[in-house]
């Protein structure tokens, strides 16, 4: 059923949080949930009854972590390990454990370490717990979001300024995309869910709640801000028209609605970095996923938590998969405010020159008009996957790696 109180509250919270952080100005958002929610409520109740048997089967498959682990190939493993440079006795935090590919690689490089494995996905947490049985002295599994990480780390006995390395591997994992009932992929039909936390928070809105409740202006704002979709108004209008006839509850149902807003020739007109055709609804799915999971706010909070818990000289490695994530990471590492409107590359040059001219002044926090620099970049330019890596793992084609040392 549609979660009215929570949905209204989280909708307002998202707005206030975005305006406060200044990362993106989404403009004026609606304050009321549409009356279509009532019709959706009744429809969803019947849908849940019809789908119970199928979902139980999927859940049992989801618990088979051995199978799920094989579905995810970690991206840029060698580069991640080199940037983290694990040494004997050090302590690390993998903030996006997933199926543990990067964690295993780090342990293979240096087994005599302690590694805290954090993930918001209960399936990933189950895999981390299973792996901790094989590495009882090394791995500590933690279930939670980036925004909960500080409290969870303190509870686990980790003090600020003590970690030697932190890894963030953002976006969806293959095991999430390839599990239809999670509702992340437009290629496999399933309930329109998209919650990375799974069923941990029953009142948390799903993607179906979003597309069936928000008005056209709000939907267009989400598509524009989180999907960078230039046809946001057209797609939002198509969603409004379709849900007036029937509630939108399935992934391929939403994909078909988006496709129907364009001529057939446009369905796969867009190309990815490998020049392969991509579905016209890809950006729409990205936008709703980011909104449902509050991903960009979570990322910014995660970066601040990493900075707080890393020791001076500790390494931060962040893998992103779209420009919104990379932009936040880049600005954070360069000390550029999220509200900065100057061209980023030009602004970067100003900061670098300022660092050379008055390095000591910045360190002491003397009035310079800028925050003291907190990071030294390991690489001057962002790292991307090698051609061979992309051939082996096409899903990692858009990966960007940024690494820095805390000053």
Swiss-Prot record:
Assigned EC number: 2.1.1.-
Chain spans, region Disordered: 44-63, 386-407
Entry keyword set: Methyltransferase, Mitochondrion, Phosphoprotein, S-adenosyl-L-methionine, Transferase, Transit peptide
Leader sequence residues: none
Xref: Pfam families: Methyltransf_5
Annotated compartments: Mitochondrion matrix
Family annotation (SUPFAM superfamilies): Putative methyltransferase TM0872, insert domain, S-adenosyl-L-methionine-dependent methyltransferases
Disulfide bond entries: none
GO MF term (any one): rRNA (cytosine-N4-)-methyltransferase activity
Biased composition (Basic residues): 397-407
Main enzyme class: transferase
Matching InterPro entries: RsmH, SAM-dep_MeTrfase_MraW_recog, SAM-dependent_MTases_sf
Name of the protein this chain belongs to: 12S rRNA N(4)-cytidine methyltransferase METTL15
Organism: Bos taurus
């Amino acid at each position: 059923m549609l979660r009215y109180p929570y949905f209204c509250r989280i909708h307002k919270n998202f707005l206030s949080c975005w305006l406060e952080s200044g990362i993106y100005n989404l403009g004026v958002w609606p304050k009321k949930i549409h009356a279509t929610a009532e019709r959706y409520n009744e429809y969803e109740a019947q849908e849940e009854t019809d789908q119970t048997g199928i979902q139980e089967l999927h859940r049992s498959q989801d618990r088979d972590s051995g199978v799920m682990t094989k579905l995810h190939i970690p991206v840029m493993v060698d580069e991640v390990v080199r940037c983290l440079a694990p040494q004997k006795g050090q302590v690390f935090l993998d903030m996006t454990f997933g199926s543990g590919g990067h964690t295993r690689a780090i342990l293979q490089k240096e087994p005599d370490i302690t590694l805290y494995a954090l993930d918001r996905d209960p399936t990933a947490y189950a895999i981390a717990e299973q792996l901790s049985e094989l590495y009882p002295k090394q791995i500590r599994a933690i279930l939670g979001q980036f925004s909960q990480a500080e409290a969870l780390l303190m509870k686990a006995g980790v003090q600020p300024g003590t970690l030697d390395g932190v890894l963030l591997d953002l976006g969806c994992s293959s095991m999430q995309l390839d599990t239809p009932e999670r509702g992340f992929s437009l290629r496999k039909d399933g309930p329109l869910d998209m919650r990375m936390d799974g069923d941990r928070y029953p009142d948390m809105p799903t993607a179906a709640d979003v597309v069936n409740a928000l008005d056209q202006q709000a939907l267009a704002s989400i598509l524009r801000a989180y999907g960078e979709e230039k046809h946001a108004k057209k797609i939002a209008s198509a969603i409004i028209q379709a849900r007036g006839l029937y509630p939108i509850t399935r992934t391929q149902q939403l994909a078909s609605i988006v496709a129907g807003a364009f001529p057939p020739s446009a369905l796969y007109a867009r190309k990815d970095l490998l020049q392969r055709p991509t579905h016209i609804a890809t950006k729409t799915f990205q936008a709703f996923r980011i909104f449902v999971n509050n991903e960009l706010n979570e990322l910014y909070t995660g970066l601040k938590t990493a900075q707080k818990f890393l020791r001076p000289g500790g390494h931060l490695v962040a893998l992103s998969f779209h420009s919104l994530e990379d932009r936040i990471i880049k600005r954070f590492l360069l000390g550029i405010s999220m509200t900065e409107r100057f061209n980023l590359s030009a602004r970067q040059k100003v900061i670098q020159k300022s660092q050379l001219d008055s390095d000591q002044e910045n360190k002491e926090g003397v009035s310079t008009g800028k925050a003291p620099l907190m990071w030294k970049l390991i690489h001057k330019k962002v790292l991307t996957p090698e051609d061979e890596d992309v051939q082996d793992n096409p899903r990692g084609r858009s990966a960007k790696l940024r690494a820095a040392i805390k000053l």
